[in-house]
Swiss-Prot record:
Ranges that cross the membrane: none
One Gene Ontology term from the biological process aspect of the record: plasmid maintenance
Originating gene: repA
Keywords: DNA replication, Plasmid
InterPro entries per UniProt: Plasmid_replication_init_RepA (IPR003446)
Protein source organism: Escherichia coli
Protein name (Swiss-Prot/TrEMBL): Replication initiation protein
Secretion signal, residue range per the UniProt entry: none
Region (Disordered): 42-61
Amino acid sequence: MAGLKNTSYNAVHWSQLAPEEQIRFWEDYEAGRATTFLVEPERKRTKRRRGEHSTKPKCENPSWYRPERYKALSGQLGHAYNRLVKKDPVTGEQSLRMHMSLHPFYVQKRTYAGRKYAFRPEKQRLLDTIWPVLVSFSDAVTHTVGMSVSRLAREISPKDSKGKVIPELEVTVSRLSRLLAEQVRFGVLGVSEETLWDRETRQRLPRYVWITPAGWQMLGVDMVKLHEQQQKRLRESEIRQQLIREGVLREDEDISVHAARKRWYLQRSQDALKHRRAKAAASKRARRLKKLPADQQIHEMAEYLRKRLPPDEAYFCSDDHLKRLAIRELRQLELTLAAPPPH
């Protein structure tokens, strides 16, 4: 038996075939073309071929721990982080205490999430790295991770001495996005309900994830205490106070976690739109000014700044000071000026 080819996964017995295929099988058997009663299914004809390129990720072994300058997490969030990460009392070196990729939950829900096999080693290491980041930047009110997927990818990517991401070793956004989408299918993460389309930049607005109760249970936190702490922070949250000021809520009314999370995401989307609009306007202004000579650039920028200064500040602003502001603004737009900046 050891020498036989294992065809139990892709071959079927002739009796399980359709009547027409059974007739064709016995014709082949009598003609000597069939030598076994197990029939392999006909493979689909496709032009797809395995390429010669490498499929290994740029960053095979990512690592991230909460920096010392960060304030320690309080309550059950701190308990969850301490269950994930341990610190050597002698050397102060941090390392993983719990590998989330080996949690039995992923084995139990494997079929439910659409997987057949366990995680590959490179995905295990990425999953072990991302969970401390998710807990570390989780909001105590909504349990929403305060970073978009692209910012999370930059956070865990290796950086050089200047703090910039090394392109050859980065954790790509697409790789992390696929991992988080799979965690959503497992039910341990939730994702923002809708992703708005920005017509100006032809890009979607950032997506945010939040840790579900199933995710917190995996981390081993006290769910009763976690709920009590969340409700307390929810009553004191700026989102609730803002709704009270707008007249949407009364002083004695509480806001649900779902409503607070939706309000939080709406605010983040508006902030992203404002930032993109300002960036697009600055880029358009830079392209227009780049065609002008240096002195004309300074004049145009000075007039632009004069119109946007507060009235009291514009009244006392001298031409020399306005010129310095214009040159500084032009250099921020990365325009090359012939004259050096004034000292």
